[in-house]
Amino acid sequence: MITTELWKENEGANLRNFHEEQDLKSVNGALALRKDIEKIIDKIWDEGFDNIFYIGIGGTYASAMQVEVYMRGRSKLPVYVENAAEFLTTGNKRFTNKSIAILSSVSGNTLEMIELVDKVHEIGGKVFSFIDTPNTVLTQPDKQDYLILYPKNEQLKFYMTANYFMFKNGEFAE
């Protein structure tokens, strides 16, 4: 039988695994990527594209769905979200040789994401990757066209990307 007496906080209520100083440093490091992200998007914008696809598997797919909903409600840019395994199985007729696939991987070695990158390149599309772990398969030159290498803060990186695409499209007054 479980009772409430079996569980007591040693130091009162607290957030487990929350380390304020480390988390602030990590977020500030991700925010410092803004200029690099903007340079990449400027290049993508200048080269031209027809669609933006946020593609992921697992938690990255969840992050991709959030940013797609965010953009869809605020932008006229053609933005889509795909589950990597489904894309590999069924494809998407909207994805062309002028499309951009934006993805993220913590390990840099996720099988579905590796196969996805190969499929995108086979179609002729471009890959903009956020990879957390250096010296992995997805950091190799043939596995991405644009690379940001920085751990954690996937959603922040995706939202900075979305916001700058919308800024380039004249969808922010400031």
Predicted regions: what they are:
Residues 45-174:
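Glycine-rich phosphate-binding loops that contact phosphosugars or nucleotide phosphates
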Residues 1-47, 165-174:
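Cofactor-/ligand-binding subdomain signature composed of acidic, glycine-rich
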